[in-house]
């Protein structure tokens, strides 16, 4: 039974997901439905957490909008997510960057990874 489930999940997983890590700045384009119109909306910010669970994988992106911190959790293989583009690579030493929630200004900056 689990073999069938794994096969179905593998078919539904996206193949074009770029490799990104916590600390990277990404732009996620998401389909938004407003009334009868459907359009793409971009959300750009720093990846603060990644949850790897196959088809159920998710990642959290944080950005500052009008001086207010905004976090959004995206399902990696969701049909709502159109594309993910890595804008900048960040050098961090932790897997979860929740400490950025308390930081503002220069202390919230992340060094750029050179490789």
Curated annotation (Swiss-Prot):
Pfam family for this entry, one: Ribosomal_L19
Highest taxon listed in the record's lineage: Bacteria
UniProt-listed InterPro entries: Ribosomal_bL19, Ribosomal_bL19_CS, Ribosomal_bL19_sf, Translation_prot_SH3-like_sf
UniProt xrefs under PROSITE patterns: RIBOSOMAL_L19
GO CC, any one term: cytosolic large ribosomal subunit
GO BP annotation list: translation
Alphabetically ordered keywords of this record: Ribonucleoprotein, Ribosomal protein
Family note: Belongs to the bacterial ribosomal protein bL19 family.
Described purpose of this protein according to its UniProt entry: This protein is located at the 30S-50S ribosomal subunit interface and may play a role in the structure and function of the aminoacyl-tRNA binding site.
Protein name: Large ribosomal subunit protein bL19
Organism listed in the record: Pectobacterium carotovorum subsp. carotovorum (strain PC1)
Source taxonomy: Bacteria, Pseudomonadati, Pseudomonadota, Gammaproteobacteria, Enterobacterales
Gene name linked to the record: rplS
């Amino acid at each position: 039974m689990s073999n069938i489930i794994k096969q179905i999940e593998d078919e539904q997983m996206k193949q074009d997901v770029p490799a990104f890590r916590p600390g990277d700045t990404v732009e996620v384009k998401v389909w938004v439905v407003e009334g009868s119109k459907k359009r793409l909306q971009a959300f750009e910010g720093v990846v603060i957490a990644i949850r790897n669970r196959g088809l159920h994988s998710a990642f959290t992106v944080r950005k500052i909008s009008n001086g207010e911190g905004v976090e959004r959790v995206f399902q990696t293989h969701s049909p709502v997510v159109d594309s993910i583009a890595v804008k900048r690579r960040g050098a961090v030493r932790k897997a979860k960057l929740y400490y950025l929630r308390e930081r503002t200004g220069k202390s919230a900056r992340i060094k750029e990874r050179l490789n």
